[in-house]
Every structure is written in C-alpha cells, then in structure tokens.
C-alpha cells in the first residue's frame, strides 16, 4: 500500500494502484476516511508511522471498495475507534432499505454514528453529494479547503465525473445509482472552490477548478 503525504495533515493511502483512503491528522488522533479493501494491516502500519492512533473512521459511502477493511479495523481497534456512516447508506447495510448499484458487502460492524450532511467530524465538514449512492457525502477540510470527494469524481486517467463512463476508469460510473444527481453534486462541489481534490480512485489534483469544470462539461453533454 502506497502512502503519500498530500498535505501537511492528510496522507493518501493507495491499494491496488487505484483504491484510496485517507488518514487525516487531528488534535486527538487520526480520522480515517474510507477503508479501501483488504488493507487493515497496511492502514494500521501507516497510522503507526504517523505516531498517532486512529480514533474515528468516517465513510463517504457504503460501497465495498470503501468499507472493505472496516470489520478488520474494528476488530483490531475495538472500542477505541468510532465508526461514522451516512444515514441512507447505513440503512442499506442494515437491511432497512433496498440496495442500489455497486457492491454492498455484508458487514459485521454497525456504525456508532449515522450522520447527515452538515455535521463536523473533527476538522472535516460533511458535504451532501448524493448520486453515486443515495447517502454519499464528501468531506471538506475546513483548515485549508482540501476536498475529499469520494466517488463523485475520479482522477485515474484524468479527472472525470462518475455520471458518465470514462474509458480509462469506468468502474465508478458503472456503480453510480443516479447519474443526474451525481452530476448536480459535482457542480455543488466545484462551487466550494477546493484548494485540492482528493478522490476514491486516482491521484490528488492540486488547484482543481479547471479540471473539475472540464469534467463537469464533458459529463453534461
């Protein structure tokens, strides 16, 4: 698993070349955003290298490539870690509403907190960005406006909106439940004027305004 410090406070961890999760440094420890898959040992090792404990796991959405290491991490960390999942996706995992497109693995771990957009998780503000899943959220780091956009956008092979198939990385679009809603979310995220774009699949994109706008334009055709 490749670890790359993308800001002074955020480390991007990449599994299988194109599946990302993020360790965000806070005063009380680390927030892990998403968990990749089959990566618990590597994530724990990365946290150890940073010299801080993982105190919470905040999920952008409930697809398997974002929650795939959750059970193993919860077993390793126990009550020391708080798990937070967007309410609609938590309902799907609990069997309270039907599954949508994409992989929804069976989880032994129930979230400690089901949250709605607008909440603050440490320095991260949860921003509504539904479409890829009904509950999908993004996280804006209020300290420097770094945006963790989950699967609203991808950047593997170039920045793209996950509302339309991108030949170099089609998988996110194939798993998007509502492409039109996802496109509206992409526009809303662009309006936040992030300083850095981080996504679930692909490299970090500094100064992303032009790339986001072009991706939105392509997806709108």
Predicted regions and their residues:
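Conserved beta-strand hairpin/beta-sheet module of binuclear metal-dependent hydrolase folds
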Residues: 1-49, 139-150, 155
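Short, flexible loop segments at the rims of nucleotide/cofactor-binding pockets, characterized by
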Residues: 8-13, 33-36, 59-60, 124-128, ...
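A short catalytic or substrate-binding loop motif that flags glycine-/basic-rich loops and adjacent residues
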Residues: 14-17, 129-133
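Residue-level marker for buried hydrophobic side chains located in beta-strands
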Residues: 31, 58, 83, 146-148, ...
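Metallo-beta-lactamase
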Residues: 38, 125-128, 134-210
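Active-site HxH/HxHxD metal-binding segment of metal-dependent hydrolases
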Residues: 38-121
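Short glycine/proline- and charge-enriched loop/turn segments
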Residues: 98-107, 162-171, 219
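Binuclear metal-ion centers of metallo-dependent hydrolases, dominated by the metallo-beta-lactamase
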Residues: 206-221
